[in-house]
Amino acid sequence: SKVVYVSATPGEEEKKESGQKYIIEQLIRPTGLLEPSIEIKPTKNQVKDLIEEIKKRREKKQRTLALTLTKRLAEALSDYLTEEKINSQWLHAEIKTLERPKILKELREGKYDVLVGINLLREGLDLPEVTLVAILDADKEGFLRSETTLIQTMGGAARHLEGHVILYADQITGSMRKAIEEIKRRRKIQIEYNRKNKIKPKAIIKEIRDWPFAPKEKEISSEFWIIQDKKLLEKEMKIAARNLDFERAAKIRDLIKKSNEGLD
């Protein structure tokens, strides 16, 4: 049998299985949009600085995503921002599946200026109104600040002409350096393509829609609800575990358990 992996950030397992000569990059965007610009700032007074950056975006009716290391920090930061007269909401795994799309819709509509979370962009969120992704404590090595996670997270600011990333860090870790180099490489490729083809980057216009599922459908999984093949799920779980993506592996494990209960 043959398998085709499709990923913006393939893990080591996929790369190993594919072999370098069989990996095809698809980096060019027809819209001409570039990868975001990147800035590194010290962690001292990072929250104070973040507040000023959020206010700048708010004046232009733009949104911000802020990434912390823990759920507790996400909630605490969101509460503090609210006290500072910034419309903020936190979002992490404890938010029910059917609540998440509602919060994201409200962010896009402007009810919130900023969304605070842990790994918001690992699920491929498409939020064209977001112009700033702020990663707090970016130099704390670990899964949430790995090269792959940083690339995925920074890519969340690539849906807007003014996309920008701020990494709050006192040192440049290996993961940070590799992620920054990769984003810059992709940005350079797009700039050259735009120049050769006389393309002027265009903003993404995306309609804000209501979540299509009714509230009674409480058992929908946000990522795997259409997958019926148990063996495929088990393979995905193993790949996630090998790539140290334990949160993803746990989600798939729970889904397999639910499907088994449904067969009993």
Regions found by a protein language model. Name each.
Residues 41, 91-93, 117, 168:
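Conserved beta-strand termini and adjacent loop/short-helix elements that scaffold enzyme active sites
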Residues 62-70, 91:
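Conserved RecA-like ASCE P-loop NTPase motor core of nucleic-acid helicases/translocases
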Residues 1-61, 72, 78, 103, ...:
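N-terminal cationic and glycine-rich segments that engage phosphates or anionic surfaces
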Residues 82-86, 90-115:
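Conserved motor-coupling elements within RecA-like helicase/translocase cores
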Residues 8, 69, 93, 119:
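Conserved H-loop
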Residues 69, 74, 80, 84-87:
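C-terminal catalytic or substrate-handling cores of phosphate/nucleotide-
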Residues 56-64, 84-87:
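Short, surface-exposed connector motifs at secondary-structure boundaries
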